[in-house]
A protein has these predicted regions:
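Bacterial N-terminal signal peptides that target proteins for export
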Residues: 2-11
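Bacterial N-terminal signal peptides
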Residues: 11-21
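Conserved catalytic region of serine esterases and O-acyltransferases that act on ester linkages
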Residues: 29, 219, 223-287
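Extracytoplasmic/secreted envelope proteins and their assembly/folding machinery
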Residues: 46-50, 133-140, 185, 236, ...
Length: 287
């Protein structure tokens, strides 16, 4: 073998090693996700999302900017005033949640090199497109200039209330769950298109899908917030699959005490929602 051929083999070998090393690095890279929301983002990301990712070897840092019932309009006011109005909950790579009070949007946006940032409307207004139209563009503009260009913005499609909900905001939808769900799906789809947001996380559709199973309308703990196991797990599965593009069906993680049938409902409801984010998929899963 002449010297030139040996040289080429060495160079090719080094390139292969570099590519393999790059692949390992990419797998080990910590993905940073921030939700600018309220108690519905608390339900979706503060538990189970870290564990679902960890089960597939994905390292995460997950943040939630929390004010109970916070609307897009209020987020915009807080941005304008640079108000230290948020509880900032942060789940580190170790899975432990820590909280800092009196935090501003500006401070939290600068806290990490965020890969994904989600926005959402407060539940009473979540199916009213005009409320997105009034506040979302300004909030997007505020956020974008404070984030790296690589950061992907997302819109969180939240869920309709339980059919028996006593929440005052249910009157906006004639106290009808399907009316509320369809209004949310339509408003979020329209808002995402109008504001060029390419990633919609269809938690609302996933919850509605799960309601077609043997579980029925038992995904909430108080008529509007999610049940702490099956409800929150369904939402977390949806976030996981939409962000990481890994089919969540078969993910080994489930919260303690959740049986296999309910685990299957949550995972399949989420998977179907990511495939069809604006329509309900009937699930034929028996207990």
């Amino acid at each position: 073998m002449n010297v030139m051929k040996q040289y080429k083999i060495v160079v090719i070998g080094m390139c292969i090693l570099l590519l393999l090393a790059g692949g390992v690095y990419a797998q080990q890279k910590t993905v940073r996700i921030l939700a600018i929301g309220n108690s519905f983002s608390q339900d979706a990301v503060e538990q189970y999302l870290h564990e679902l990712a960890e089960a597939e070897g994905i390292s995460t840092i997950i943040g939630n900017m929390f004010i109970g019932g916070c609307s897009l309009e209020r987020h915009v006011k807080n941005a304008r005033d640079n108000a230290p109005a948020y509880a900032y909950r942060k789940i580190g790579t170790d899975g432990k949640k820590r909280e800092k009070g009196k935090m501003s949007l500006e401070a939290v946006l600068a806290d990490e090199d965020w890969d994904y940032v989600s926005l959402q409307q407060a539940s009473p207004f979540s199916g009213m497109y005009e409320t997105y139209e009034a506040s979302l563009p300004e909030l997007i503009e505020y956020v974008k200039v404070r984030l790296p260009k690589k950061t992907k913005l997302m819109l969180h499609q939240t869920w309709a209330y339980a059919s028996t909900s006593k929440h005052s905001g249910f009157k906006n939808y004639n106290c009808n769950q399907l009316t509320m769900y369809q209004a949310i799906a339509d408003a979020v789809k329209k808002a995402a298109k109008a504001n060029k947001i390419k990633i919609v996380i269809p938690s609302g559709t996933a919850i509605q899908n799960a309601r077609t199973s043997f579980i029925g309308d038992h995904l909430n703990r108080d008529g509007y917030h999610l049940d702490v196991k099956i409800g929150r797990y369904t939402a977390a599965c949806t976030w996981f699959e939409r962000i990481f593009k890994h089919n969540v069906v078969g993910n080994p993680y489930a919260p303690e005490g959740l049986d296999e049938a309910r685990k299957a409902v949550a995972q399949k409801a989420a998977h179907a929602a990511v495939k069809h984010p604006y329509k309900v998929t009937e699930l034929s899963i028996t207990n």
